[in-house]
Amino acid sequence: MSPRVLGGLAAFLCLVLDQANKLWLIHVFDIEARRPVRLAPFFDIIYERNPGISYSLFRAQSAMGRWILVALTLFAILLLSIWLWRATNRLVALALGCIIGGALGNAIDRIAAGAVADFYYFHIGSFSWYVFNLADAAIVAGVALLILDAFTSEEAGVPAPDSEGHS
């Protein structure tokens, strides 16, 4: 499978899983009426609308702010898609696909509802992590894969596999 196809499939899969999960939690499971749902002493499913980006940074409280975030997200997706189109390494393509799919999932939320739907909340004692969704997880996984590639690529002194998996 070529890097482009792999990245495209990863983006599609991340987008579909994210949107299906959000639709199911909101419209079928009715998380808004049930929240919070404790799955473990350290993990809850809750329902939050985030008008900003990670950690609620750059909260878009106005319509103009919302559309600026949408435009910046779509521009980033365009740049990442160009990078994916040129990628010759499957790990990089997979990483970019995850980031693109996650970014598209959150962009759809912001366009349709003005904010991103977040559900997953980890906490231990007084420590708590931010509330996130599957799109956020895909973006983080993609960034982690890019970091892995940076440390294992030819530039780092280790031959990277080509599109057939040969070093």
From Swiss-Prot:
Its EC number is 3.4.23.36. The active site is at D118, D136. One of its GO terms (biological process) is proteolysis. Keywords: Aspartyl protease, Cell inner membrane, Cell membrane, Hydrolase, Membrane, Protease, Transmembrane, Transmembrane helix. The keyword Transferase does not apply. It comes from the Bacteria. PROSITE patterns: SPASE_II (PS00855). The keyword Oxidoreductase does not apply. One of its GO terms (cellular component) is plasma membrane. It is found in: Cell inner membrane. It is a multi-pass membrane protein. It catalyses: Release of signal peptides from bacterial membrane prolipoproteins. Hydrolyzes -Xaa-Yaa-Zaa-|-(S,diacylglyceryl)Cys-, in which Xaa is hydrophobic (preferably Leu), and Yaa (Ala or Ser) and Zaa (Gly or Ala) have small, neutral side chains. This protein specifically catalyzes the removal of signal peptides from prolipoproteins. Belongs to the peptidase A8 family. This is Lipoprotein signal peptidase.
